[in-house]
Design a protein with these regions (language model features):
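Short beta-edge/loop segments at beta->alpha junctions of small alpha/beta modules
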Residues: 1-84, 184-203, 251
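Hydrophobic alpha-helical interaction segments
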Residues: 31, 137-252
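Short, intrinsically disordered, mixed-charge
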Residues: 43, 91, 165-169
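Short linear loop/turn motifs
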Residues: 43-45, 56, 99-105, 225-228
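Long, compositionally biased
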Residues: 68-72, 116-120, 196-199, 210-214
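Exposed, interaction-prone assembly regions rather than primary DNA-binding/catalytic cores
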Residues: 82-138
Length: 252
């Protein structure tokens, strides 16, 4: 393969691939770039090798959203969740600029070093919902206004249950309550559906308790209309990682 051909290919890459995100060997192959040629380009400084099979253009300071969309193609169910999802939709409490981004996904996954070195983040994998079908799972992921197309973010109704699942563990109970207090006009039908398939008794009961205290929704009407998973008829009690003894009644 002569140098002129390699130069032509890299020119096509530079013209055809948008800046702002990494790319992989599958994408490079669409431009006629083999793994060997990609390695050659990396050795020559035309590409930067981020990890095995993952590249970017040199001096391309790609942003978190481009990187997330790249990971979304590889990690089932990956989305911005919990506190981070609420913040992107206007519900925030003293959010620091370097605060770790909360990401959720459907399976075990370790965020790659090239991502976490640029964007402080943590990944949560938990079976929080027993989805009755894929439609509800998809319907509760959205792209808030102003964000790149197809970037997946948990809708507020889903994000708050992700937040409450982590309350007292990775998320302080006090901040969780402050964020909960910032919720406005949740969609009651969507909430009812989510509470009916939420597998965390703690998250469900904490939601019902705080919803009663804040009058966020009519809890009794919600319980009457939907088969909300509240667990047994006894109190749910647990000492959280932060030392708090949490005691929750079945219906809030």
């Amino acid at each position: 393969m002569n140098g002129n051909y390699r130069h032509q290919v890299i020119k096509r890459l530079q013209a055809g691939l948008p800046r702002g995100a990494p790319f992989d060997l599958a994408t490079l192959s669409q431009f006629g770039v083999s793994p060997q040629l990609a390695a050659h380009y990396a050795d020559g400084g035309w590409l930067v090798r981020l990890a095995h099979g993952v590249y970017a253009f040199p001096n391309d300071e790609f942003g978190v959203y481009g990187a997330l969309k790249f990971l979304q193609q590889r990690v089932p169910g990956l989305h911005v969740g919990g506190k981070s999802a609420l913040a992107l939709q206007g519900v925030r409490h003293n959010l620091g600029s370097r605060e770790a981004l909360v990401l959720w996904g459907d399976g075990r996954f370790a965020l790659p070093a090239w991502f976490t070195s640029r964007f402080p983040a943590r990944y949560v994998h938990a079976r929080l919902f027993d989805w009755p079908d894929t439609a509800l799972a998809s319907k509760t992921l959205t792209t808030p206004p102003g964000l790149p197309e197809d970037l997946r973010v948990a809708a507020p109704e889903r994000a708050v249950l992700e937040l409450l699942y982590e309350a007292g563990v990775k998320q302080s109970l006090e901040e969780a309550r402050n964020l909960f207090d910032g919720l406005r006009s949740p969609r009651k039908d969507l909430l009812g559906q989510l509470l009916s398939c939420c597998a965390s008794v703690k998250a469900v009961r904490l939601f019902l308790t705080w919803a009663r205290e804040t009058s966020l929704v009519d809890v009794d009407a919600l319980l009457e209309q939907y088969p909300v998973r509240t667990g047994s008829n006894t109190r749910w009690m647990s000492r959280l990682d932060d030392g708090t003894l949490l005691s929750l009644k079945p219906h809030g």
